[in-house]
Structures are given as structure tokens and as C-alpha cells.
């Protein structure tokens, strides 16, 4: 009784809200984003102060009219006005408190952690060696799986990942002051929205019209009858489709031994729109040994390609090193002419062997340029031989 008297005294001291204040509070109630939660065992709606300030700054009261100044010009003016609304019991300030686990649950978890830690240490030593071998295979499979999953559409049986949110509760704040920021305020003012009023009025009219069904004209009664039958058939057909698609999936799954997963109208029971529930027409997945073998073959081919590329790079490096070391193994500078002639003769012989091997005959196909080179080389050799014989004969004569 004493609390009620105090509450009445506060209302009398503050005074009743004006029409303008009611209009501002109503606009804020239906346009400011709100969330619902539990407070003291009751379901309440709350809003954040910063969003309320932004909402009022975008309202019609923030724009100046002809002959009148704007009610809200800055954030500070909005905060002052919201303090007036708070004092007139349109909303009140609340404190957000995070929910904590009970001490018993914490102790149980600690005891379980100690008992499991000893067992896990033994298992870890055994599993580490096995995991190292599996990690390489799993990484390759994940890459292939991610590519396939991106192409596939979501089936109705696949569970969606839920985002974990921290739970909290609201408690009344001791300091009832409106502050701009992330402060939480709970709504007390709860007017009836125009939409709810209109919907209620339509519902009342529909009930009265249904009770007067015998007084309707014959044509209207027949039309309503056919409409109701058509709506009932449509609902029944959707239910039958949902049952039939499950039966079809089970039949195909049993016949193929769980390898083929065929869904007719996979999004029929999904949380999507009316049109999206009828597309795609079907989805098919193959989950058998061949799919696993193909993945393994792909991974093996990739490994072989990598090893071949590494071997080629190593062989090329060796050839480059041999090519650099070859000129260091040659003789002195004085034998440069003889080496040049040897290399020329070797090249000619290689060219002849290539021509003969390419044609597959015993006859050698030689171009004009090669014939001229051979004749020039033979003439040079004969001249060298003659020059060598002349000094020998002169020496014998002496």
C-alpha cells in the first residue's frame, strides 16, 4: 500500500503527459528498433538509447515548420526531452546482467575435466602418430569437398549451424536517468497499433458475416463452397506431396544401398517463400565407393605431377651444371683448331645419322649446303696433306 501511494504522489508531482509528448512517445515506440527479453519473470520490450536519439533526429519534429522552431536540433536536446518522458513513466532504465552458471555446475565440470585429462593424455600419445598420417589426406579431401559443397544446393536434411549468443537478463537500475549511449531502457507505454485495431475490426466483421451464411444469396454460397473445397484440396495435395517425396527417397535409398540420395522438391518443407519451395524440381547426390576412389585418384595424380615437375627441375639443374663444367675439361689453347675441326666432323656425322634415321633407308639424304661444306673440308684436308709431304721430301733429299 505504501509503494502505491508513493507512486501516485510521483505521478501527481510530475504531471500528466501532454498530447505532444504522447505523440513523440508513440512515434518512438513503433519506429525505434526494439528487442524482447525476460525481466523479473515478465516478457518486456527494450530499446537502446543511441538508436532512440537517432530515430527522433530523423522524425518530423527535427524539421522546422513555418513560424515554429524545430523541437530536436541536437542530440543533447533529444536527451533532455527523453528525460522528461522517462520521468512521466513512458519507459524506465534497466541494467543488463549476464547469466552465469551455478557453482555446482562449475564444480562438476572441474571434476569431469580432471578425470578425463588423465585418460586423454594416454590416448593422445597413441593418436598423435595416427593423426599425422591422416592430416595430409584430410586436407586434400577438404579442398575437394569445399569445391563440391559450393556447387551443391542445401538439402532439407542438412542441419544449419546455430550462432551461440550470450544470455543475459534485465534488472531495474537505481539511477533513473536517460543517457546517450548503449544504455538499455524498458518500455512501459504500450499503445494499440493502428494495424492491430484494423485487423481486429476485420476479424469481427468476418465472424458476423459467417454467422449470417444462411441469409446469403445462393450464388455467393455456391462460390464460397467451391473456394473452400479448392483450398482444402490444395492443402491436402501439399501434405501428400511431402509424404510421397519421403517415400520415394526411402525406396531409392533402400534399392541402391544408401548410395543414391534423390529428393523430389527438396525445398517443399524448408523455411523459404512459396515460389522457392517448388524449385529446384529435384536434387541428386551419389555417395558410394566410386566417389571416394575418384577423390583418391585425383589426389594421387596431383602428387605424381608435383613429383614429375620436381624431377624435371632437378634434371635441368644438373644439365646446366654439366654444360658449365664441360669447357673447363678441355685441353690447352694450342689445340683449339683441332677441337674445332673435331666438333664440325661430329656435327656432320650427327646430321647424316638424323637424316638416315628419319627416312628409314640405307641411303643418306644430303642437302646442297652440306655437300658444299663437305667438299670444302676435303679440299682443305688435301692441301694440308700436300704441305706436310713437301717438307718431308726436302728433308729426305738433304
Swiss-Prot record:
Membrane topology (UniProt): Multi-pass membrane protein
Q: Which residues lie on this side of the membrane: Cytoplasmic?
A: 1-196, 256-398
UniProt cross-references to InterPro entries, sorted A to Z: Sec62 (IPR004728)
Q: Membrane-spanning residues where?
A: 197-217, 235-255
Ranges of Basic and acidic residues composition bias in the record: 106-155, 289-324, 330-354, 388-398
Where are the Phosphoserine residues found in this chain?
335, 341, 353, 356
Q: Which GO terms describe its biological process?
A: post-translational protein targeting to endoplasmic reticulum membrane; post-translational protein targeting to membrane, translocation
* UniProt biased composition (Acidic residues): 372-387
Where, in residue ranges, is this chain on the Lumenal side? 218-234
Show the Pfam families listed in the entry: Sec62
Cellular compartments per GO CC: endoplasmic reticulum membrane; membrane
Phosphothreonine modification, residue list: 158, 375
Which keywords appear in this protein's UniProt record, sorted alphabetically? Endoplasmic reticulum, Membrane, Phosphoprotein, Protein transport, Translocation, Transmembrane, Transmembrane helix, Transport
The places in or outside the cell where this protein is found are: Endoplasmic reticulum membrane
Q: Where is this region: Disordered?
A: 106-167, 289-398
Q: Family membership, please give it.
A: Belongs to the SEC62 family.
What does this protein's UniProt record list under function?
Mediates post-translational transport of precursor polypeptides across endoplasmic reticulum (ER). Proposed to act as a targeting receptor for small presecretory proteins containing short and apolar signal peptides. Targets and properly positions newly synthesized presecretory proteins into the SEC61 channel-forming translocon complex, triggering channel opening for polypeptide translocation to the ER lumen.
What is the annotated quaternary arrangement, including any partners? The ER translocon complex that consists of channel-forming core components SEC61A1, SEC61B and SEC61G and different auxiliary components such as SEC62 and SEC63. Interacts with SEC61B.
| Protein name according to UniProt | Translocation protein SEC62
Q: Which organism is it from?
A: Mus musculus
Amino acid at each position: 500500500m505504501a509503494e502505491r501511494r508513493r507512486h501516485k504522489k510521483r505521478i501527481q508531482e510530475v504531471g500528466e503527459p501532454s498530447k505532444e509528448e504522447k505523440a513523440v512517445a508513440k512515434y518512438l515506440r513503433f519506429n525505434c528498433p526494439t528487442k524482447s527479453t525476460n525481466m523479473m519473470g515478465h516478457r518486456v520490450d527494450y530499446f537502446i538509447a543511441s538508436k532512440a536519439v537517432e530515430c527522433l533526429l530523423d522524425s518530423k519534429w527535427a524539421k522546422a515548420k513555418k513560424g515554429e522552431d524545430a523541437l530536436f536540433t541536437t542530440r543533447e536536446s533529444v536527451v533532455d526531452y527523453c528525460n522528461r518522458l522517462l520521468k512521466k513513466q513512458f519507459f524506465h532504465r534497466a541494467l543488463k546482467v549476464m547469466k552465469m552458471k551455478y557453482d555446482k555446475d562449475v564444480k562438476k565440470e572441474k571434476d569431469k575435466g580432471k578425470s578425463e585429462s588423465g585418460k586423454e593424455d594416454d590416448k593422445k600419445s597413441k593418436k598423435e602418430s595416427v593423426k599425422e598420417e591422416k592430416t595430409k589426406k584430410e586436407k586434400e579431401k577438404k579442398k575437394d569437398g569445399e569445391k563440391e559443397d559450393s556447387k551443391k544446393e542445401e538439402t532439407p536434411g542438412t542441419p544449419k549451424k546455430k550462432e551461440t549468443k550470450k544470455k543475459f537478463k534485465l534488472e531495474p537500475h537505481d539511477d533513473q536517468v536517460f543517457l546517450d549511449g548503449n544504455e538499455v531502457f524498458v518500455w512501459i507505454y504500450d499503445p494499440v497499433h493502428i494495424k492491430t485495431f484494423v485487423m481486429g475490426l476485420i476479424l469481427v466483421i468476418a465472424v458476423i458475416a459467417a454467422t449470417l451464411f444462411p441469409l446469403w444469396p445462393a450464388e455467393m454460397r455456391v462460390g464460397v463452397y467451391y473456394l473452400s473445397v479448392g483450398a482444402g484440396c490444395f492443402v491436402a495435395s501439399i501434405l501428400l506431396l511431402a509424404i510421397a517425396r519421403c517415400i520415394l527417397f526411402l525406396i531409392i535409398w533402400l534399392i541402391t544401398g544408401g548410395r543414391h540420395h534423390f529428393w523430389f522438391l527438396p525445398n517443399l518443407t524448408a523455411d523459404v517463400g512459396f515460389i522457392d519451395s517448388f524449385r529446384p524440381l529435384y536434387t541428386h547426390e551419389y555417395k558410394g565407393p566410386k566417389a571416394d576412389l575418384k577423390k583418391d585418384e585425383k589426389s594421387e595424380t596431383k602428387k605424381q605431377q608435383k613429383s614429375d615437375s620436381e624431377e624435371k627441375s632437378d634434371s635441368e639443374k644438373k644439365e646446366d651444371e654439366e654444360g658449365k663444367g664441360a669447357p673447363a675439361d678441355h685441353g690447352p689453347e694450342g689445340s683449339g683448331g683441332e677441337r674445332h675441326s673435331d666438333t664440325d666432323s661430329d656435327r656432320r656425322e650427327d646430321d647424316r645419322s638424323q637424316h638416315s634415321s628419319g627416312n628409314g633407308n640405307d641411303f643418306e639424304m644430303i642437302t646442297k649446303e652440306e655437300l658444299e661444306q663437305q667438299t670444302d673440308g676435303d679440299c682443305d684436308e688435301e692441301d694440308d696433306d700436300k704441305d706436310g709431304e713437301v717438307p718431308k721430301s726436302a728433308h729426305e733429299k738433304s
